[in-house]
Structures are given as structure tokens and as C-alpha cells.
Amino acid sequence: MSYTIAAQIRTEIGKGSSRRLRHANKVPAVIYGPGKEAISIVFDHKDIINIQANEDFYTTDLTISLDGKDVAVRVQDMQRHAFKPLIEHIDFKFA
């Protein structure tokens, strides 16, 4: 199954800005890979919480729609809240 997630590039980096994003029901994330510069992104929590429950979300390539461009990525790491059903941060790797 193919997944497409709409995201925006984030300009504010750091702990404070990430906390503000999480408070606004957004998920900060980063896309990185060898030979390419890392891209900090943000997307809505509701866009990711339901599709991450599927097993193939972690094993197949995903498409992130980023400012009109489609970027193929794969989930590298996901940080979750300790006891709430929230995703706090996701690391993607270029596919």
C-alpha cells in the first residue's frame, strides 16, 4: 500500500519551537540521508496517527508531498509519548 503525507518545511528549529508545534497538534520531523542535506518538516498529527497503525507503514516507501514536490522516504525512527497515544517526532530517511 502506498501512503502520501502532506508536510511543510519548518524554519524554526529547537526544543521550544518543537514543543509549540506539538501543543498545536503538529508533529516535527526530519528527512536525512547520505549525500543529501537534512530537511526539517512538520505535518498534522491526525495525518499520521491512523496510518502508522498499519504494519507496512514501517517497511514500505512513503511519499511526502513537500511544497509541491514528492519526496520518497522510509521511516527510520519514531518517538512516542510515554503514556499518551501521541507521536512526538519522526525521522525519515531518503528512499
Swiss-Prot record:
Pfam families on file: Ribosomal_L25p
A molecular-function term among this protein's GO annotations: structural constituent of ribosome
Recorded superkingdom: Bacteria
Keyword Acetylation: no
Keywords assigned by UniProt, alphabetized: Ribonucleoprotein, Ribosomal protein, RNA-binding, rRNA-binding
CDD domains per record: Ribosomal_L25_TL5_CTC (cd00495)
Gene Ontology CC entries for this record: cytosolic large ribosomal subunit
GO biological process: translation
Known partners and oligomeric status: Part of the 50S ribosomal subunit; part of the 5S rRNA/L5/L18/L25 subcomplex. Contacts the 5S rRNA. Binds to the 5S rRNA independently of L5 and L18.
Similarity-based family: Belongs to the bacterial ribosomal protein bL25 family.
Alphabetized PANTHER family for the sequence: RIBOSOMAL PROTEIN L25/GLN-TRNA SYNTHETASE, ANTI-CODON-BINDING DOMAIN-CONTAINING PROTEIN, RIBOSOMAL PROTEIN L25_GLN-TRNA SYNTHETASE, ANTI-CODON-BINDING DOMAIN-CONTAINING PROTEIN
Functional note: This is one of the proteins that binds to the 5S RNA in the ribosome where it forms part of the central protuberance.
Name listed for the protein in its UniProt record: Large ribosomal subunit protein bL25
Native source species: Shewanella piezotolerans (strain WP3 / JCM 13877)
